Amino acid sequence: WIVEPCAMMNRRSAICLALGGLAGIQGCRKREDGAAKTDAVISPAGSEPPARKDMEGNSLVPVTVDPEQVIRTIGGLRPFRSSGFVVRRDELGGKTLVHNYGHGGGGITLSWGSAHLAVEMAGEVSGKECAVVGGGVMGLSTARLLQLHGAKVTIYTSDLPPNTTSNVAGAQWWPFSVFDDNRRTDAFAQQYVAAAKYSYEYFQRLGGPRWGVKWLPNYYLSQGPPKNGWIAGPGGVLRDLQVGLHDFGPGEHVFPAPYARRFHTMMIEPSVYLAELLAEVQAAGARVEIRKFVDGN
């Protein structure tokens, strides 16, 4: 049951219930005698009738939330930049250096698209030696695309999966919490949209248990009618990536908020996905050196 403050552009202005396949519905709690009580929906007064079968979300099974089932608590710091991620080419000491960092809450989501921008910016790489700094999702994705362009790749990293920040990502495919809307430039907007669309298409090739990628409905809950922004909803630049977009009003769904917006997208299991990506990169001939870089030299 994942409930967090969320909106398409302002995560604090509404309630977001993500991961439709794990949606939590009020009314699954323990009795005092230890027996489970499974009434469909319980209102504060306890008088609300069970949900109708035709209501959106009625087929979802509530998860069991029990502190005794928690095996560990972990966290990862998102590399958020209010002006958005950076993909930029520099020349340093006779070498070409391409920056690719700062993806906030959209690292796995944007990984293939942002890596594609970086590889395109690098120019012709076929037959050349290329170094990639970082062994998380962005480094591995960039390494793989470089290989597909004919490069010989060495990855320099202090950690590899499963010990990267990417491994603790939620990895729901949707590029949110990547930038502040009031800092968005036209140049960044172009990169953002291009990266999102490329990545969306690439991930669809990886669906299935081997890569740990599957489709799930996502539900965004709010106290008022769902708001549309620059990214999402009718008129949004990524509207075409919201498969099955539909809004539900009071009485049309089972969730504990007046309004719900649903769309289908991919869910990526980081532990499965990153292990497979690392294996593929290494099988294609990449060298890996465990090493830390302390400065730009």
Regions found by a protein language model. Give the residues of each.
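N-terminal secretory signal peptides and thylakoid transit peptides that target proteins
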Residues: C6-G21
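Glycine-rich active-site loop/strand segments that organize a redox cofactor
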Residues: L160-A195, G244, F248-E252
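A conserved short coil-to-beta-strand element within the FAD-binding core of flavoproteins
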Residues: V288-N297
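Flavin (FAD/FMN) cofactor-binding and adjacent substrate-gating region
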Residues: G75-G94, S166-V168, E201-A284
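Glycine-rich FAD pyrophosphate-binding loop
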Residues: H149-T165
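C-terminal catalytic lobe of FAD-dependent flavoproteins
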Residues: G57-V125
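Short beta-strand to alpha-helix junction loop
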Residues: G106-L110, A187-K197, R261-E276
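N-terminal Rossmann-like FAD-binding beta1-loop-alpha1 element of flavoenzymes
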Residues: C130-A151
